[in-house]
Amino acid sequence: MTTNTHTLQIEEILELLPHRFPFLLVDRVLDFEEGRFLRAVKNVSVNESFFQGHFPGKPIFPGVLILEAMAQATGILAFKSVGKLEPGELYYFAGIDEARFKRPVVPGDQMIMEVTFEKTRRGLTRFKGVALVDGKVVCEATMMCARSREA
């Protein structure tokens, strides 16, 4: 995917996502086009606390966190495409289909998340996501998010 490069640094990401340490899983946005696609990066460090238990002696980045990183990338794309939310509104992760894990992600990897907008229907926005390491697919899924007021 090539287009005019639009990047977002961590300060801008923090303005868009409600996530914070230790659950913020997007380090930088490499490129995006509003309403179309977004490419983001997660640098995987051995210092992540979950590696103590997943798995001792054989650290593997948890698959659910790969999905969460892709979901956070969809949230950024949604915010950049729709604009600011009203006070009290959030984008919620609403569903996932066709999730597949192809290979493990380990400390030292740089994981690239590519998400593309598919459609909005009945208040749900659908995205296709893929995570790559060294150009190889590690995970792919279809994800949905919903714009909603906080309960």
From Swiss-Prot:
<keyword id="KW-0444">Lipid biosynthesis</keyword>
<feature type="active site">
    <location>
        <position position="54"/>
    </location>
</feature>
<dbReference type="GO" id="GO:0005737">
    <property type="term" value="C:cytoplasm"/>
</dbReference>
<dbReference type="InterPro" id="IPR013114">
    <property type="entry name" value="FabA_FabZ"/>
</dbReference>
<comment type="subunit">
    <text>Oligomer.</text>
</comment>
<keyword id="KW-0963">Cytoplasm</keyword>
<dbReference type="GO" id="GO:0009245">
    <property type="term" value="P:lipid A biosynthetic process"/>
</dbReference>
<comment type="function">
    <text>Involved in unsaturated fatty acids biosynthesis. Catalyzes the dehydration of short chain beta-hydroxyacyl-ACPs and long chain saturated and unsaturated beta-hydroxyacyl-ACPs.</text>
</comment>
<protein>
    <recommendedName>
        <fullName>3-hydroxyacyl-[acyl-carrier-protein] dehydratase FabZ</fullName>
        <ecNumber>4.2.1.59</ecNumber>
    </recommendedName>
</protein>
<keyword id="KW-0441">Lipid A biosynthesis</keyword>
<dbReference type="Pfam" id="PF07977">
    <property type="entry name" value="FabA"/>
</dbReference>
<dbReference type="GO" id="GO:0016020">
    <property type="term" value="C:membrane"/>
</dbReference>
<dbReference type="InterPro" id="IPR010084">
    <property type="entry name" value="FabZ"/>
</dbReference>
<comment type="similarity">
    <text>Belongs to the thioester dehydratase family. FabZ subfamily.</text>
</comment>
<keyword id="KW-0456">Lyase</keyword>
<keyword id="KW-0443">Lipid metabolism</keyword>
<dbReference type="GO" id="GO:0006633">
    <property type="term" value="P:fatty acid biosynthetic process"/>
</dbReference>
<dbReference type="GO" id="GO:0019171">
    <property type="term" value="F:(3R)-hydroxyacyl-[acyl-carrier-protein] dehydratase activity"/>
</dbReference>
<dbReference type="InterPro" id="IPR029069">
    <property type="entry name" value="HotDog_dom_sf"/>
</dbReference>
